[in-house]
């Protein structure tokens, strides 16, 4: 939440205008990366803790997890060495414990499915997810040639195995 509010605020300043983060139209200068990672992490923490608490009571299914957060940081900050940082290593250790299902499609299909994301941003995201999913995803579902109902069926099969 804090990161979102701050990003909206910073989008009004020309020194932060850019499309590394296409959702807010900002670019965080490289000197501010460590600070921005902390801002993003502080926004993630309440969500993560709530999910962990709820998972003690019931299975929790969500579309955004730690793997997504790591990809978000790497791509929006153009920070491929994030996993070498203290915060990155900490999150990687937590992400290994999550049961991730990587839902993917080929880049051409993704470009048809999303309207407001620049192709260059999408390509970076796909590349990052493809590499990290090898280490952090329990299962991968390719939705390229599947209908939404077929994809849901595959997801349910994966969930039964987890």
Features from the language model and the residues they span:
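Generic surface-pattern signal
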Residues: 11, 15, 44, 75, ...
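Short, well-ordered beta-strand core segments
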Residues: 60, 100-102, 140
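A glycine- and Lys/Arg-enriched "phosphate-lid" helix/loop adjacent to the NTP-binding pocket
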Residues: 64-131
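Hydrophobic helix-cap positions at the C-terminus of alpha-helices
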Residues: 51-55, 94, 132, 162
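ATP-dependent small-molecule kinase phosphotransfer cores
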Residues: 2-77, 82
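NTP-dependent small-molecule kinase module
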Residues: 108-162
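Local beta-strand N-terminus motif with an aromatic residue
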Residues: 57, 96-98, 137
């Amino acid at each position: 939440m804090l990161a979102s509010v701050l990003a909206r605020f910073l989008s009004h300043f020309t020194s932060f205008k850019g499309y590394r983060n296409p959702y807010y139209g900002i670019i965080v200068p490289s000197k501010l990366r460590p600070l921005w990672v902390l801002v993003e992490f502080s926004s993630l923490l309440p969500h993560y803790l709530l999910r962990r608490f709820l998972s003690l009571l019931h299975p929790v299914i969500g579309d955004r997890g730690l793997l997504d957060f790591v990809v978000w940081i790497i791509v929006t900050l153009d920070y491929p060495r994030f996993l070498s940082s203290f915060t990155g290593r900490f999150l990687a250790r937590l992400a290994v414990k999550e049961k991730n299902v990587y839902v993917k499609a080929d880049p051409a299909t993704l470009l048809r499915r999303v309207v407001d994301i620049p192709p260059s941003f999408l390509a970076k995201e796909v590349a990052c997810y493809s590499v990290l999913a090898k280490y952090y995803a329990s299962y991968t579902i390719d939705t390229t040639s599947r209908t939404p109902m077929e994809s849901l069926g595959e997801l349910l099969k994966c969930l039964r195995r987890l």
